[in-house]
Amino acid sequence: NPCPSAVEKLVSLLETDDNAYVRRATAWSLANYDNQIVLEPLIKALKNDVAAVRLWSSSSLAEIGNVSLKNAQLAAEQLLISLKIDNEPGVRSNCIWSLCRLYEKLNNTFQESFVDECTKIALFDKEPSVMEEAKTALDSMGMQGFYN
């Protein structure tokens, strides 16, 4: 259960704790908070050197993004960047999942960018699990056949 008085401490742990397990758990916990203060730290955590922190941050951004159109757009912009540049397949798959959760809240231009990126991944990615996640996302958005 979220505790409003814990938000600042959790954000501090995410940003400064030396233990990657603590940062990962904190990124996961922050999904329970719908206030604006957690959005930016989670976005910054997408650049963390530990894949598990990036993975859980991307999941939490899907939750925080669903709170408002503004949050959805801010989270989605960074998730799309991470999808394009992250080397870890699990993180990239999770970015696709998170973007798919935010899809309905995004403007048409961004939706098109996401569909284009998923199509490229479904057709050309070197990692089969990421390709499959992109195909699943396209199917869920009603874009069956875009990758055949």
Predicted regions and their residues:
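Short inter-helical turns and helix N-cap capping residues of alpha-solenoid HEAT/ARM repeat scaffolds
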Residues: 18-19, 49-50, 87-88, 126-127
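Structural detector for internal amphipathic alpha-helices that build alpha-solenoid repeat scaffolds
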Residues: 1-3, 12, 21-35, 44, ...
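Residues within HEAT/ARM-like alpha-solenoid scaffolds
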Residues: 74, 87-90, 113, 129
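Amphipathic alpha-helical scaffolding segments comprising HEAT/armadillo-like alpha-solenoid repeats
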Residues: 2-14, 35-47, 69-83, 105-122, ...
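Short, mixed-charge aromatic SLiMs
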Residues: 54, 120-126
